From Swiss-Prot:
The keyword Nucleotide-binding appears for this protein: no
Subunit-structure text: Monomer.
Function: Catalyzes the hydroxylation of urate to 5-hydroxyisourate (HIU). Is likely to be involved in the urate degradation pathway to allantoin. Prefers NADH over NADPH as the electron donor.
One Pfam family it belongs to: FAD_binding_3
GO molecular function, one term: FAD binding
Annotated EC: 1.14.13.113
Family, as annotated: Belongs to the FAD-dependent urate hydroxylase family.
Gene: hpxO
Record keywords, A-Z: FAD, Flavoprotein, Monooxygenase, NAD, Oxidoreductase, Purine metabolism
Binding site residues for FAD: 11, 30-31, 43, 125, 287, 297-301
Protein known as: FAD-dependent urate hydroxylase
Catalytic activity: urate + NADH + O2 + H(+) = 5-hydroxyisourate + NAD(+) + H2O
Site for Involved in substrate activation for the transfer of oxygen from the flavin hydroperoxide, residues: 206
Amino acid sequence: MKVVIVGAGMGGMSAAIALRQIGIDTVVYERVTENKPVGAAISVWSNGVKCLNYLGLQEETAELGGKVETMSYVDGHTGDTMCRFSMHPLIEQVGQRPYPIARAELQLMLMKAYGIDDINFGMKMVGVENDTAGSAAKATFADGTTVSADVIIGADGAGSITREYVLGGPVSRRYAGYVNYNGLVSTDDAIGPATEWTTYVGDGKRVSVMPVSDDRFYFFFDVVEPQGSPYEEGRVREVLRAHFAGWTPGVQTLIDTLDPLATNRVEILDLDPFHTWVKGRVAVLGDAAHNTTPDIGQGGCSAMEDAIALQWAFKDHPDDVHAALAAYQSARTERAADLVLRARKRCDVTHAKDPQVTSRWYDELRNEDGTNIIRGIVGNIVGGPLTPVTAATEG
């Protein structure tokens, strides 16, 4: 059996490794010519880490991951700690430490595990279809190349061409209402403790820092802005100083420290969940299937879960492509949709879609001992192929 995977992002590479583990011939095509992911880092929660471990990357993942011992919320205006709590109850409940990881390093780890020389870079897919006999699927690339395979997996991102084919037309993404500015800086106690995930909140905005490897923080600023607001590259400090004027010194230090030319600006969008992921021998995976906001940190993790579910589906149905893809779709659509909607709900609370609701959340944070926050995070983590719901995780 030959499976073509279009897209060498986290989902595509995880799927390629997972299918190769069970002896399936995989070929990966990627439109870019070098490893330049959008976003500086990613929070890989325990369900995602378990997927990476399953793919044989336990040591590499732990080496790249930041060690988060505690989590805190801080009043952005006063600098007062609203709550601080240990992450160890979460680790004990789900059986795995989460790891924030620099995105380019995670991507490179996956590519190396699969074999960088086995990835076909610079190949932009412009069309995908099943053949008229239903015996193969075909992808067409911008250079005129066509490839046929028993299965084509479209891991071609949020603007997926594969999704258009599977659904029979384009689907509009929804602007979530905010812009995320993100990057990497050296750890600095003036910004936050080196082993803590620190989040400053206020006025429907947030600033967050978390440790990644090599004594660095991954940081992001969330700002409510109209979609398409003008922005001049390299002027991020001026923009953030205006948005966060009067905020606590830790935030000002972060703004002063960041590299304006290495800071990403991302308008955040998502997709309404849909439950048709397969058309004949063509299927979607990752952001192509469930583009989500980053508000619960599950987008990449969900893509990795897709990869494991895809492997299991082909394990169960090694000689029946259609049964395997149907099993994959059945295993994933409800779970992925739930994560999209959980993220959307958290997004609205965090970014003051209803200011009264957000104000109540700030009050709750001031009375939080970590129990409720950890319960919510565990609720996001469980439900995937390697993190089934158990009596322990339900508690």
